[in-house]
Amino acid sequence: MSDTSLKEKTAKGLFWGGFSNGIQQLLNLGFGIVLARLLDASDYGMVGMLTIFSAIAAALQEGGFISALTNRKETLHKDYNAVFWFSLMCSTTIYILLFFAAPLIADFYDTPELIPLSRLSFLGFVISSMSIAPRAYLFKNLRIKDTTVISISSLIVSGIVGITLAANGFAYWGIALQSISFITVMTILNFYFSHWRPRFRFDFTPIKELSLIHISEPTRLDVIS
């Protein structure tokens, strides 16, 4: 890629990144206002109890692979493939641990309803892990317009799901399913726009190299987003 072409793509990426952030904030504000009128504070509290577990699991799951793949000078299919299967295995392991830890979480908060709610909510880790490789492919190729369409479309669909469920009395389940629908739509669209597909080859050699890249270098992704 020539310097001129890279500059043009970076400039477009900055534009679409800013546009995406603005639209997402407006959508979040709009959907948030509607949901606040339909739900009680206790409904948000139920989901909020799981936030710390979600944050820790999400950090462990992604592991900086998107930025590492974006930074790597030459990225091959085997690199994306290694990240896909490694992330899926890690997220599945985390989910299994949290699945069996659900009763302990519920006991800690003295809220039995958290058992089924947490087991549903934590499914998002497994689903989102499958989008790491194709999303990294889009960022690597500076296809920020596509990631903008993906993010906005996912927000709209999940917002409609959340409002519909909340309006029909699903309470905190509506919030949980809104999150799951957002992750699911985003994962599907990442595959659709990237045209990247995993192969059943389990070579995790690139994982160590990508981990070192993430630790030692900044990333274009940080600038664009």
Enumerate the language-model features and the residues they cover.
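Short, amphipathic, aromatic/basic-enriched membrane-interface segments that mark the entry/exit
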Residues: 14-19, 141-151
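Interhelical loop/hinge segments that connect adjacent transmembrane helices in multipass membrane
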Residues: 1-6, 10, 145, 188-216
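Single conserved hydrophobic/aromatic residue that forms the stacking wall/gate
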Residues: 213-214, 218-225
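Signature of the first transmembrane helix
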Residues: 9-63, 90-102, 124, 154-163, ...
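Membrane-interface helix-capping segments at transmembrane helix termini in multi-pass transporters
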Residues: 36-50, 72-82, 95-122, 165-176, ...
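Transmembrane-helix boundary and interhelical linker motifs in polytopic inner-membrane proteins
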Residues: 2-11, 36-42, 54-88, 92, ...
